[in-house]
């Protein structure tokens, strides 16, 4: 069983990493191709492309300029410790044990516009490049064209040791589109998190994002390799709703946040 998460736009490179253990991304040379494409853009062009403010555009232009194929303790940080935001607030990787992180290293992957797919302990230099960005590149009109089957094949290589391979999709729709179901040699299960509001259950973005991180943490702490055990997930009041679920879409609900 492999869990996939989306990355986060918010990054934390101020807090020193609490462990030194690290790996390197699998697709550094591919990332370098995208960086070269991004370096050709002015801050104004970056701002227009990514729909971000002028200060953010300048910040990211500088990040692209500084990016290197050499990943060091000074210019990078383990991905799961560098990403911030709602999902990663739920995951709270800074409070996971070293053994927890090693389990995550085997069972968790983070999809990325720049890096393709990351292990939790892969060193990562700061960047902003959302998967849905329409960045024309040597591979085509956007990042889905650029990554092609690469991400899916990397996941297949990881899943091939499982007797009944299952990919648990805790990523957003934008990011999961980089995974090609027809190429993937695994069953896909997508947990959905709903909260009670206005007299009915609905997906509330902030809560749903946090719940994805909470479920990833639950799987790590309980060493879950059989996805069926995820149905026991009960963090922060969620419970599996069998009546609203099917084989591919598992719904978890709670009455009060």
Swiss-Prot record:
GO biological process: response to hydroperoxide
InterPro entries assigned: YaaA
Gene Ontology cellular-component terms listed: cytosol
HAMAP family: UPF0246
Similarity-based family: Belongs to the UPF0246 family.
Protein name: UPF0246 protein RSc2009
Species of origin: Ralstonia nicotianae (strain ATCC BAA-1114 / GMI1000) (Ralstonia solanacearum)
């Amino acid at each position: 069983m492999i869990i996939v998460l989306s990355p986060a736009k918010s990054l934390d490179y101020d807090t020193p990493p609490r462990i030194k253990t690290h790996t390197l991304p699998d697709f550094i040379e591919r990332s370098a191709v995208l960086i070269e494409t991004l370096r050709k853009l002015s801050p104004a062009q970056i701002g227009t492309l990514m729909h971000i403010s002028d200060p953010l555009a300048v910040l990211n232009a500088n990040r692209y300029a500084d990016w290197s194929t050499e990943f060091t303790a000074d210019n990078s940080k383990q991905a799961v410790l560098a990403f911030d935001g709602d999902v990663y607030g739920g995951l709270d990787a800074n409070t996971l044990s070293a053994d927890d992180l090693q389990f995550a290293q085997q069972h968790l992957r983070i999809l990325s516009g720049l890096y393709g797919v990351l292990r939790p302990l892969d060193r990562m230099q700061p960047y902003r490049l959302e998967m849905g960005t329409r960045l024309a590149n040597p591979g085509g009109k956007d990042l889905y064209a650029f990554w092609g089957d690469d991400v899916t094949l990397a996941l297949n290589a990881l899943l091939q040791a499982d007797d009944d391979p299952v990919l648990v999709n805790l990523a957003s729709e934008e990011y999961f589109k980089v995974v090609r179901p027809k190429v993937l040699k695994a069953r896909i299960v997508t947990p959905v998190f709903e909260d009670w509001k206005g007299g009915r259950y609905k997906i509330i973005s902030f809560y749903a994002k946090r719940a994805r991180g909470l479920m990833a943490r639950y799987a790590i702490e309980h060493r879950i390799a059989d996805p069926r055990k995820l149905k026991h997930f009960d963090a922060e009041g969620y419970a599996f709703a069998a009546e609203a679920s099917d084989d591919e879409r598992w719904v978890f609900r709670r009455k009060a946040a």
